[in-house]
C-alpha cells in the first residue's frame, strides 16, 4: 500500500460519491435531464417536485450503499465514510453539508477524543444528522443524509470486529 495507494483510494472513494450527486444537480434542471431520465414531458407533463426530491435522495444514497454492500464482494464492503464525504461535496459550491461532517470528525478525534473509531463514527454521524435537520437547506439533503447516517451506523453495528470499551477524553486531560 503506502501513502500513494491511500491517497488514490481516498480520491476514488470520494469521487464515486461526488460524481453522481454533482452531475444530477447540474443536469436536473436542464433540457438534457428529460431524455436521460426517459421522461417525455409532452406525455407526462412537468415532473412533480416530490419525484425529483426522492430521485435526488436515492442519488445521494446509492454510492454509499454500493460502497458498504458491494454485490461483487458478497455485500462485505467498507464503512462508507469517504464516499459520504464525496456525496456531500457533490453539493458544491454549497460545502455546508461536508463541513458539518468534517467538523464533528475533527471534534471527536482531536478535542473530545472518542475511541475507538467505531464509537467516534457513530457519534459523528448522529451529531451531524441533528445539525442537518436544524440547518439543512433542502428536504432532499436532510432525507439523504439521514438515510446515509442510518446505513453507516447499521454497517458499523453489524461489523463483526471486536469492540473495545468506549473512552471519551478531553484534549486538555490526559
Please state what every model-predicted region is:
Residues 22-23, 110, 130-134, 151-158:
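Residue-level signal for alpha-helical transmembrane segments in multi-pass membrane proteins
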Residues 12, 16, 20, 24, ...:
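Alpha-helical transmembrane segments in multi-pass membrane proteins
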Residues 5, 39-46, 50-56, 66, ...:
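Generic alpha-helix detector with strongest preference for long hydrophobic helices that associate
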Residues 116-144, 150:
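Canonical bilayer-spanning transmembrane alpha-helix
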Residues 1-18, 33-36, 47, 67-83, ...:
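Interhelical loop and helix-boundary elements at the membrane-water interface
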Residues 1-2, 81-114, 126-136:
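Interfacial segments of multi-pass membrane proteins
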Residues 22-58, 89-98, 133-144:
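Helix-coil boundary and interhelical linker segments in multi-pass alpha-helical membrane proteins
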